């Protein structure tokens, strides 16, 4: 029996069974509804509740659940919760720090992390509007820095600079100049026409991602203040980048950069803007080049900005291990790893599987674009891997690159369980001595937690896993050490024995 919490361990030690406990689940749901509460230090798997849905480990024994409910009822009687209470709002006050610049915000506690959450804000200037650049003061009234303000977001302030640095046109141009300068130092224009120009917190521009695809700049926006200024930023970036250049031929669109703005619907709702209101100039699809492979990118309907530039270096490295190999690309999206393995690496065969039907269709187009044959399957990855295992199918190289499985801290346990299960299935499809590359793009999943899930998958299947490297995102995705989340991508290279 695989345990996820202390209750599983106690149940195992007591020899309890795994009988269904739906009635206990319903009773527990009825006891606590609404809000996010941390109720019992002994119930790690049930540390948080949201919208009345308990975070129960699947298969928890009836006796353990009953004991847990009793414990939580007693704990709950000691507190008076207000179910469904609204989240904290930033308080407005006319009494700011002495001599404060307007608009201002004063903090309860200061941090060098670029995110300042609502609970950290003591008071805000009534004149401060959503999206404004505000002067940020510490609790003693000293100027701490400047940031973008949005009282309706949980991230009330996104810090831009510390100390007395003014936020003016010169500031923005300097930041974009630093970002473009790094990409020039990396020599990316000589090897690809698809790379990340601005990496949000990694480039000290929290809330803004800019991707270059051919002659188009795609803006992915996470902050209202960035959305309000995106057209100015586009002009500044065009000045810094100069006219778009091609790897092998001039672009038909001419010397000017085209632009496109997109944002996740949930981000739009939280931050209070609509990307559709921005001018949309770019075509729905563009063709890019990377490592000699051509990819068609859907910047309108594709995931994120349409392509995963962060895996560029990992794609080439994997291709160099695929000469004459049978390759399985799990969660293949539009064929990034698989096509690079086939075209640049000389793989004997490539099979790609993904649940997104539109992505599979685009992967087929990309295979035709490169005049190669790959097998592409529209299926759920878990079901497909089980089917291949039942059929006795194995591969020389297996890539596991799922979408983000942990989007919030309350999803961490469930997301790690999915990583464990997916890797446990995939590792059984690797021939002895074969290679497996497994990835996580969830910033909330630490390196140790991810490695733990992989190690558990190996133990569960009886396969010895030899890690020969650990990599991350390509260098156009820099990491600021005061924001470890900017180093979100984890790529573990394994030899399966």
Features from the language model and the residues they span:
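Non-catalytic substrate-recognition/targeting regions of SAM-dependent transferases
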Residues: 198-211, 229-308, 316
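S-adenosyl-L-methionine
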Residues: 358-394
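Conserved SAM-binding motif I beta-strand of class I
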Residues: 349-354
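Conserved SAM-binding loop of SAM-dependent methyltransferases across substrates and taxa
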Residues: 334-347
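Non-catalytic accessory regions of SAM-dependent methyltransferases
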Residues: 69-214, 244, 254
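C-terminal catalytic and target-recognition region of SAM-dependent MTase-like enzymes
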Residues: 394, 421, 435-497
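Mobile active-site "lid"/loop adjacent to the S-adenosyl-L-methionine
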Residues: 378, 395-425, 431
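Conserved class I S-adenosyl-L-methionine
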Residues: 324-331
């Amino acid at each position: 029996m695989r345990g996820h919490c202390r209750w599983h361990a106690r149940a195992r030690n007591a020899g309890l069974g795994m009988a269904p406990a739906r009635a206990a689940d319903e009773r527990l749901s009825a006891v606590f509804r609404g809000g996010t509460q941390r109720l019992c230090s002994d119930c790690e798997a049930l540390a948080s509740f949201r919208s009345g849905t308990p975070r129960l480990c699947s298969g928890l024994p009836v006796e353990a659940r009953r004991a847990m409910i009793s414990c939580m009822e007693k704990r709950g009687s000691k507190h008076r919760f207000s179910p469904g209470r609204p989240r904290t709002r930033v308080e407005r006050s006319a009494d700011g720090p002495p001599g404060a610049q307007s608009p201002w915000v004063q903090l309860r506690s200061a941090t060098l992390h670029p995110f300042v959450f609502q609970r950290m804000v003591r008071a805000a200037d009534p004149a401060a509007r959503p999206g404004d650049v505000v002067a940020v003061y510490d609790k003693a009234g000293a100027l701490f820095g400047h940031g973008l303000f949005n009282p309706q977001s949980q991230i009330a302030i996104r810090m831009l600079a510390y100390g007395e640095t003014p936020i003016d046109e010169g500031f923005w141009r300097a930041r974009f100049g630093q970002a473009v300068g790094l990409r020039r130092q990396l020599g990316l224009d000589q090897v690809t026409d698809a790379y990340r120009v601005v990496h949000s917190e990694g480039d000290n521009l929290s809330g803004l991602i800019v991707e270059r695809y051919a002659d188009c700049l795609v803006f992915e926006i996470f902050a209202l203040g960035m959305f309000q200024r995106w057209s100015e930023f586009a002009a500044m970036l065009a000045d810094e980048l100069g006219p778009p250049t091609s790897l092998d031929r001039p672009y038909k669109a001419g010397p000017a950069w085209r632009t496109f703005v997109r944002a996740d619907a949930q981000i739009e709702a939280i931050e209070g803007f609509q990307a559709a209101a921005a001018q949309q100039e770019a075509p729905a699809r563009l063709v890019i080049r990377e490592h000699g492979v051509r990819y068609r990118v859907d910047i309108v309907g594709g995931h994120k900005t349409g392509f995963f530039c962060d895996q560029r270096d990992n794609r080439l490295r994997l291709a160099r291990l695929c000469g004459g190999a049978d390759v399985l690309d799990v969660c293949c999206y539009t064929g990034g790893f698989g096509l690079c393995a086939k075209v640049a690496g000389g793989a004997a065969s490539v099979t790609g599987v993904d649940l997104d039907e539109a992505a599979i269709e685009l992967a087929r187009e990309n295979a035709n674009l490169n005049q190669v044959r790959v097998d592409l399957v529209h299926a759920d990855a878990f079901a497909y891997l089980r089917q291949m295992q039942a059929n006795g199918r194995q591969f020389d190289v297996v890539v596991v690159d799922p979408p983000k499985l942990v989007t919030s801290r309350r999803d961490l346990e469930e997301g790690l369980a999915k990583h464990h299960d997916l890797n446990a299935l995939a590792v059984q499809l690797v021939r002895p001595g074969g290679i497996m590359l497994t990835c996580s793009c969830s910033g909330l999943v630490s390196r140790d937690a991810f490695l733990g899930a992989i190690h558990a998958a190996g133990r569960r299947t009886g396969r010895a896993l030899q890690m020969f490297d650990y990599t991350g995102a390509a260098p156009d995705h820099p990491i600021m050490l005061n924001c470890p989340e900017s180093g979100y991508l984890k790529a573990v290279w394994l030899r399966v024995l």
